[in-house]
Amino acid sequence: IGGIADGIFHKGMGRSIAQRNFVPHVDCVKLTPDQKFLCAVDNGLDQVKVYRVDYENGKLELIDFIRGPLESAPRMIRFSRDGEYAYILYELLNIVEVYHYSVQDNEPVFEKIQTISTSPKKEEDICAASGMEISKSGKYLFCSNAGVNSVVCYEIEEKTGMLTPVFTTKVNSDYPKMLAIYPDEKHYLTLNNNSNDIFSYTIDYKDGYSLETGSPVKVDKPNCIYMLKLEVE
């Protein structure tokens, strides 16, 4: 890894109707699957800033925004395995927005096609959507919710990219900030920030549920988890 090629500082204030101020706060950055653009999810500004990546000169150029709803606090963006769809998780609204992604005249185009909730309406005041991942096959998207401490599984419709709920599981932990799906797609982990642990769950897609399995692993104030295959030399 070399030195820093470029740096961008987000400025301004988020839109607020409540007694709070939103300041720039980037929670997630992801390259588009074609690696032409960088998406910076700004939790405080209620938007995803899209930068063109100039690899030759090591520069980022702001060229577009995906504007979220007022006081929505976007938290994460993920792309479908075929690269045609983007999924944005909103922390304060407890929703996932689905976008069709394409490139036209060398410009990124994001077209919203679906909005779906991560929790029942009766829980919206005590819920904060926190984590989101897509399974290795691209067939399923999982979200975790803090406050109500739950995990939701959606099936991804192959032709449209749209989401259909499969099951919701109340997890035995506090603040499942992130989650990770096993490569076999039969299990997932929740990374729990407040209870300082990692729990494992077994999935039954046919009957629509998941069950806690094994013993938790204690970790002090965990924030992030990913599963990677280690290559043995």
What are these regions (language model features)?
Residues I1-C28:
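Asp-box/WD-like beta-propeller blade repeats and closely related beta-sheet repeat scaffolds
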Residues H25, A73, A128, G147, ...:
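Beta-rich catalytic cores
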Residues P33-D34, R81-G83, K136-S137, P183-E185, ...:
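Residue-level detector of Asp-centered blade-edge/turn motifs that repeat once per structural unit
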